[in-house]
Amino acid sequence: MRSFQRVCDAVAFSHSQGVIHRDLKPGNILVTGRGVPKVIDFGVAKATSMELTERSFCTETGQLIGTPEYMSPEQADLGGTDIDTRSDVYALGVILYELLCEQLPYNVKQKALHEAIRVIQEDRPDRPSTITRVIRGDIETITLKAIEKQRDRRYDSAASFGRDIKRYLDS
């Protein structure tokens, strides 16, 4: 969990530099021999100062940019160009959910793209406490807040998400 809090700090730093990662997932987090997590693969990242267009989200063949399993509802919207740093917060929340529950909040890997988008945008994840009884209380609340469908109900930043993780760990 301390490593996860450090990942939140790293993402918060990239946000402070005006960069949205857009493809946060476990495969894009490396841990050094000293246990320091490093966020990698900023290949689809966007500067917050750049105007986002439909081409920023799709390839020539209409495929989404990013990994659907970790994608926020607003990023999954094929016509949506209005993403901000809370999209990365959502992806961090999915990573935390997966760490705690040993499964993703949604199973979209084998679904057709339109069905995966519907699940991401409409379905509610199972509460972590229904999957793993030891996960309840504050950590469950923190996790579910990070993966809220409505971004205005999520943490407003990776920094505030990381602070809540730190408070939880220190309590």
Annotate the PLM regions.
Residues 37, 53-65:
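Regulatory activation segment
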